[in-house]
Amino acid sequence: MKFNAMFQPINIGPMTVKNRFVVPPMGNNFANTDGSMSDQSVAYYRERAKGGFGLITIEATVVHQGAKGGPRKPCLYDDSTIESFRKVVDACHAEGAKVSVQLQNAGPEGNAKNAGAPIEAATSIPSDCGRDTPKEVTTEEVYELVKGYGLAAKRAMEAGVDAVEIHMAHGYLVSTFLSPRTNKRLDEFGGSFENRMRFSRLIIEEVKKMTEGKIAVLARINSCDEVPGGLDVHDSAAIAAYLEGCGLDAIHVSRAVHIRDEFMWAPTVTHGGFSASQVEEIKRAVSIPVITVGRYTEPQFAELMVKEGRCDLVAFGRQSLADPHMPLKAQEERLEDMIPCIACLQGCVANMYAGNPICCLVNPFLGHEAEGIAPAEKAKKVMVIGGGVAGLCAAFIAQEKGHQVTLYEASDKLGGNMRLAAYPPGKGDITNMIRSYIVRCQKAGVTIKMNQEVTLDLIKEEKPDSVIVASGSRTLILPIEGIDNPAIIHGSDLLDGKRAAGKKVLVVGGGMVGCETAAFLGEQNHDVTVIEFRDTVGADVIHEHRVYLMKDFEDYKIKEITGAKVCKFYEDGVEYETADGQRHESRGYDSVILSMGFRNYNPFGEEIKAIVPDTYVIGDATRARRALDATKEAYEVASTL
């Protein structure tokens, strides 16, 4: 076995964990609105225990009434939810995993509407622009809050958990007491290091008293707040050492407060294990086990971290969403079967914030664990048209249901437009995702025919029972004078290496597609300008991705023309109109790149249904959207065939 260190058992207080693979606490919005765990919650956690994770951590669970950070947060502030937690614990125990539950008061990161009460913090400082201003907790109230943690821990123990994890990170309630940036108190809970640690110490002591040493007590802290005046790694090392002295059994090291959440749930451009050096410094400060987290996606680096003593356990957060069976595959050395998280943030973080159940671009079964893949009542001959992610996803699911599936791809490469999305700086992990879909198709037994354009005549000849049209999208070409000039380079042709750009380049379109194309060119030392209709570039880019994308713009000195409606294309530039109705020209470029997005491509229309009534159109073939929408529709269609 290649990963000996990762499969060694470890003791954490009174708890023995069978290996070093951890599912960290992650909000999923599967819980019921009354704070109880749903059947969906049970299935979600069971699947990750079944997949070999040694320690499963139930998501941030509310310990005080009036402190909910979202409508579907699990709660342990009264006895009514204990039984539902027991169902999760029993399900995980049956699969050999240990279970911890994270205890949280959202503090200033909550909101009064969800909480049903004013939010609270060490000091009345809002966490971000537009957020509620928290009420400063009185000295007497601090002591009452301490009791709430102890009672919640006792309820968790009654539900059968093996451990609790006290949330002290990310700008939530306890975190606001630790940092001098957010703690301006003048009582015994503010000022000196000892005073700022007092709340945490009292919580640990209360939790240990209420649980009588029968379960392990952990805490999650930041390695660094990543904001001026906040905690840095040296502060956090001292905090970790202090918490060990309070009787803590293990430290879980995360990173950053929410206003720098590009460090909390790092996007695609961030390397796996990007906080490793900070965790290592904290590990040197303590003798208790240390859990590291931060975009770990493969077991190789995790093995190195544990083997070299830089940490003791590794938490695979979003990776456990993408592939709940990752540890089992690592143990069996089925490394190519692993499904990689590409840190797109489309289905997990975006839905978590919106209060919707999370989903996953690379794992369409997330949230549907109880359903699995039901065998088809009758095997069908299924034709899938298009080898992008929608087609690949639909093909392997349909094949695993027992259908006879043939996938047709018109080009010599699979992956569709997602293959090109891997070309801009820092996006290479997308290739890994496409490869994983190909492997799933191959191992399921899907027949793949490359360089095969599908026509209505071919469909008539093959006589399929069902057809899934996943023909994708093509470059959006608006009715603008000169746009059809052969000198204009389509962004997809540029990324695919079919056409080359000159030194000075104008990229027309400043959405995600255009901005990433501009960064691709900037990295190669082109002189790049982006022109965009909206008032800002990258307006459609997820925040955490945009932070890094705009850093590329700064590093590569990419220029911007915004609020500009392109009216005419020239070989060397464009004419555009601004909001005041004035016309301007931007010319003198060696190349003009068209990157205004994509439009759906479905060459069959309704004619195909006259041949095969059981026809479905999915993904960009319906309307150009996110890859998440494509795989979601692929799952919905293929699972019902």
What are these regions (language model features)?
Residues 431-476, 483-503, 523-607:
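A Rossmann-like FAD-binding core segment of flavoenzymes
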Residues 1-385, 389, 393-400, 404-405, ...:
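Flavin-dependent oxidoreductase catalytic cores
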